[in-house]
Design a protein with these regions (language model features):
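Structured, helix-rich domain cores that form ligand/interaction pockets
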Residues: 1-220
Length: 220
């Protein structure tokens, strides 16, 4: 089975068995440029993101634990790869496919995503999300988790909250944010999104039950 099909089958089976509606929004793959970059370049033009651009600043906020020196974007797609700061790691990069679950603009095509995954033959982490037509009860989680608010460049606190320690292996973090406000959508729409590590895709296991326990509590 192909990687994307296997991921979707895993999540769809969980959704069917648990009356849930989880979706994939982002995929990340760490890779060796020596072995993969030439194949990626055959997919289209990769354009360097300007160092002082607001886009690069925004992208840096999305990458955990490591600094990045540069980023390259696949044409007009919401698909990038990052170069790492440390010299030994510069041979490696992280490719990210963003915006697979969107309402305000087209998502990357499934055909393109499949071609990328055929080249990479792996997935390092995914963002799994659920969208709600109301604001979740985030504070209900405060008795068990530390809720960290997001601060903008001016230091102002926003409605966005993070759980950076879920106490669950592979469930790296969870973010709650106003999706309608972020994307200029009409009405009320909030997103709960989990970043989940995948140590070994050949033995695919995602902590979806644990994520559901958290989303259920926020939906009460």
């Amino acid at each position: 089975m192909k990687i994307m099909q296997e991921l979707e089958a895993f999540i769809n089976e969980f959704n069917s068995s648990n009356d849930e509606a989880f979706s994939i929004d982002s995929i990340r793959i760490e890779f060796s440029k020596q072995h993969k970059l030439e194949e990626l370049k055959k997919l289209g033009n990769w354009n360097k993101v300007e160092k002082n651009s607001s886009l690069l600043s925004k992208l840096k906020k999305r990458l955990q634990k490591r600094e990045i020196t540069s980023a390259w974007r696949l044409e007009k797609e919401n698909i990038y790869y990052y170069n790492m700061q440390d010299a030994p790691q510069y041979r490696k990069a992280t490719l990210v496919i963003f915006g697979m679950k969107q309402y305000h603009k087209p998502s990357p095509s499934k055909d393109l995503i499949s071609k990328i995954l055929q080249i990479m033959k792996d997935v390092s982490s995914v963002d799994i999300c659920i969208d709600l037509p109301y604001k979740p009860n985030i504070e209900a989680l405060a008795t068990r988790y530390i809720l960290t608010p997001y601060r903008n460049s001016n230091g102002a606190v926003s409605d966005t909250k993070y759980i950076n320690d879920t106490f669950v292996p592979m469930l790296d973090k969870i973010v709650f944010y106003n999706k309608a406000f972020k994307n200029g959508l009409q009405g009320t729409l909030w997103r709960i999104e989990a970043t989940i590590s995948i140590p070994n895709f050949r033995a695919l296991a995602l902590p979806l039950h644990e994520f559901k326990q958290i989303t259920d509590q926020a939906r009460r």
